[in-house]
Amino acid sequence: MAPTAAQIKSRARALGFHKVGIARADALDGEAAERLGGWLAAGYAGEMRWMHDPRRRDIQQVLPGVRSVICVALSYNTAQGEPAPGQARISRYALGRDYHKVLGKPLKELARWIEASDPGCRAVAYVDTGPVQEKAWAEAAGLGWIGKNACLITLEYGSWVFLGEILTTLDLEANDPHPNYCGTCTRCLSACPTAALVEPAVVDARKCLAYHTIENRAPELPEAIAEHQHGWVVGCDLCQTCCPFNLRAERWGRYSEVADFAPRDPWNEITLDQLADLSDAEFERWSEGSAIRRVKASGLRRNARSALGASGDSLAQAH
């Protein structure tokens, strides 16, 4: 017997997800595809070729016959102190176990349960692994809203959440889209050191520290990026740490209880000097099961040396 929306949500929460919502497969009505097309046409994707996959604009091409999109969120925030002088700065999302692994296992389990409950249906899970506009679907499913920092912001956890989706051929009762509560706030726009937020909710990856420290494979970082690194070597959280909803979540003690997201040694206190001389063997050992592996050892060495050079000495000061 086909599971109901309520049963699926209950099962998702039992599997550990903090938020779950459902959107109809026609909920975006082409608006998201149009926005994505404009973003790509402006060149804002940089060298991220996979963003041009045409399936990203039409979910029916991802799963023919899809009728509902089940969206989940899992908080990953952990308490962070001020970085010490010379400490390498790593985005919070990368300090613990790779989120693809942490979310992927229970999400696939949920998809299998749905298909087992109704053998005639399809249910396919994605965790930042397919041509799916995750934030747009999460907003449509009522999990939160796309903020001016281009992150999905939730009332309970701010933007410190990982997202996952299950595309299914089941026709499920949908949630209402989440209202946007950013209002007149522009803190994130002002906080970005490279002006990568070219307008509210629009990131020009070519100007973004996170893009360059993770996705840019060039031997050297652009000077316009390096001079604003302030110790960042994997990602950048500046447009999130200033967000009132993230600050409120921290005041409320809304930190993730998921043990896999606890910062791992040595990443939570490694220095720029250490990373500048990182060996391939050390990287392979330390990055096992970590999203940092995407950056590669050569990328970390480049980023650390760039940050050290921009600081004027071996102690890059935090922003």
UniProtKB/Swiss-Prot annotation:
GO terms for molecular function: 4 iron, 4 sulfur cluster binding; epoxyqueuosine reductase activity; metal ion binding. [4Fe-4S] cluster 1 binds at residues 182, 185, 188, 243. One of its GO terms (cellular component) is cytoplasm. It catalyses: epoxyqueuosine(34) in tRNA + AH2 = queuosine(34) in tRNA + A + H2O. Residues 173-202 form the 4Fe-4S ferredoxin-type domain. GO terms for biological process: queuosine biosynthetic process; tRNA modification. [4Fe-4S] cluster 2 binds at residues 192, 208, 236, 239. Its main location: cytoplasm. Keywords: 4Fe-4S, Cytoplasm, Iron, Iron-sulfur, Metal-binding, Oxidoreductase, Queuosine biosynthesis, tRNA processing. Belongs to the QueG family. Monomer. NCBIfam families: tRNA epoxyqueuosine(34) reductase QueG. This is Epoxyqueuosine reductase.
